[in-house]
Amino acid sequence: MENRSLVTIAEHSKEKILYLLEMAKEFEKKPNRKILDGKVVATLFFEPSTRTRLSFETAANRLGARVIGFTDPKVTSSSKGETLKDTIMMVSNYADIIVMRHFLEGAARYASEVAPVPIVNAGDGANQHPSQTMLDLYSIYKTQGTLENLNIYLVGDLKYGRTVHSLLMAMRHFNPTFHFIAPEELKMPEEYKIYCKEHHIKYKEYTDFNEETIADADILYMTRVQRERFTDLMEYERVKDVYILRNKMLEHTRPNLRILHPLPRVNEIAYDVDENPKAYYFQQAQNGLYARQAILCDVLGITLNDVIEDAKK
């Protein structure tokens, strides 16, 4: 049987990405449906989440599915020593699809190999976050009218930021130029720079973050410095306030610039930026609903044509 799990965005072709964006567009037109009536979606969150969990659960509910799961592994048998495999096998008895976030890199891949139902990776450590990438791509497409030939600036925690790792891989199909802005301690890992070279992705690196640096940006993708990824809190304190985007820095940026952020924000975007029309991070979060509706349907074998026909009911 075909494994329809979504573990990494790197497994999606250009055609598949554009197909899912078309499906998300259909769900934005009509988000409330019964196309998943009778299905059960399990959300297993071994690591904290607000937006990802709520948007997946809302996506499932709005499509007629039922949701089961947990948000705190301490209240499950994993706190008694149950293995990830046993948890996955047990939940597979009750659900048609499992959406899982885990603190270990590679956990989603492992789950997809042992589970009899599809797995959607909702984030595995500092590794990948493919559903966030789909909503990021949808946000970029909506605001720029294209995914092709864009200047994309990634700012902040590029070492542990799984969202930027996934976005970089997805954009390989669209001839981007990436600009990595990070302190030395949080630079883009070497493996992703090698990936860029192997896939002929242009990139530049900076440590300065100012209005001159970002003047040519089409997309400015801000990230928070993730305290939970640091083993050395002194290192975290050194870098947590390094880059803060302020409204005055946007005065001479391109008119089409949009600011994205996977959220939650800590202090890397000043609150005065929220009122700037170039700020798009709250709309970006809303786009997560439509992107995740598309992901759930695709993984469960529902086609774009099914979605279009369903809208006529």
From Swiss-Prot:
Pathway: Pyrimidine metabolism; UMP biosynthesis via de novo pathway; (S)-dihydroorotate from bicarbonate: step 2/3. Carbamoyl phosphate binds at R51, T52, R101, H129, Q132, L263, P264. GO terms for cellular component: cytosol. PROSITE patterns: CARBAMOYLTRANSFERASE (PS00097). L-aspartate binds at K80, R162, R224. It comes from the Bacteria. Catalyzes the condensation of carbamoyl phosphate and aspartate to form carbamoyl aspartate and inorganic phosphate, the committed step in the de novo pyrimidine nucleotide biosynthesis pathway. This is Aspartate carbamoyltransferase catalytic subunit. The gene is pyrB.
